[in-house]
Amino acid sequence: MFVLTGYEYFLGFLFICSLVPVLALTASKLLRPRDGGPERQTTYESGMEPIGGAWIQFNIRYYMFALVFVVFDVETVFLYPWAVAFNQLGLLAFVEALIFIAILVVALVYAWRKGALEWS
């Protein structure tokens, strides 16, 4: 009799997880409509003819704000599980979270002083 251990279950799960996206992409490739010609390749802007080119350069300040946002968004992702389990973790986890927040505050002050958050 064949007995499955934990590794066989994991490999089966990995195989299925790899197979599902491949099958989905293959099915969409086979079932999609064929090329509709040059009209289908044009840009659609609410039924109007597009004005100007589609390739414009954004100001670098947008990227700086986006980078600062991502840093603090990741902070939220790390602090949420800590806040949920706050009662069970104890004082050491509280000190670690304070150190983590302090590092991010120092980074925010640094970005502020360097002018990364100024729009002028």
From Swiss-Prot:
Give the record's GO CC terms: NADH dehydrogenase complex; plasma membrane-derived thylakoid membrane
Membrane topology according to the record: Multi-pass membrane protein
Which sequence ranges are marked TM in the entry?
Answer: 2-22, 64-84, 89-109
As its record notes, the protein acts as a catalyst of: a plastoquinone + NADH + (n+1) H(+)(in) = a plastoquinol + NAD(+) + n H(+)(out); a plastoquinone + NADPH + (n+1) H(+)(in) = a plastoquinol + NADP(+) + n H(+)(out)
Give the protein's biological function: NDH-1 shuttles electrons from an unknown electron donor, via FMN and iron-sulfur (Fe-S) centers, to quinones in the respiratory and/or the photosynthetic chain. The immediate electron acceptor for the enzyme in this species is believed to be plastoquinone. Couples the redox reaction to proton translocation, and thus conserves the redox energy in a proton gradient. Cyanobacterial NDH-1 also plays a role in inorganic carbon-concentration.
Q: PANTHER family under this entry?
A: NADH-UBIQUINONE OXIDOREDUCTASE CHAIN 3
UniProt-recorded name of the protein: NAD(P)H-quinone oxidoreductase subunit 3
